[in-house]
């Protein structure tokens, strides 16, 4: 009796390419390190500024509502207020609570970070670029220089393609 031979079918996996035009988080770690160094701010404080950026006017209770997900820091609100990241917009009065908003300094910092995330070169006038204090700062500095070069070349390519 002849033996049956089963033909094995070979499955071919398809590669589904994704649209990476909005890949702004690719270099987030380096951008965050640069921003923390440039603005001399902590990572939770920066996250709080990102939250407040779109809030407009807010109460202190709204601030503390988002603050609960960070490590415990009772002085965060006071520090951001004293350092000029947020400002009092309205004093409290009978029947009204005080209102706060992000300062021009805070809005400009977050706006700059968004621009960098969308491909603008990072400024090299930060403490990280002035002196090589630690090995990690040197590594980040070299990586950021490489990124800036890549961002500039990409911007030039887009400029020549659109003409």
Where are these regions (language model features)?
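Glycine-centered, phosphate/nucleic-acid-interacting loop/turn motifs that mediate DNA/RNA or nucleotide
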Residues: 56, 84-87
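Short acidic, hydrophobic short linear motifs in intrinsically disordered regions
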Residues: 55-67
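Short alpha-helical segments that sit at the start of domains
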Residues: 15-48
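Short, cationic-aromatic polyanion-contact patches
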Residues: 41-42, 91-116
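Short amphipathic alpha-helical elements of helix-turn-helix/winged-helix folds
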Residues: 48-55
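Eukaryotic partner-binding/assembly regions in large regulatory complexes
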Residues: 1-11, 156-159, 163
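Short, amphipathic alpha-helical interaction segments positioned at domain boundaries
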Residues: 104-139
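Short amphipathic alpha-helical interaction segments
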Residues: 68-82, 96-97
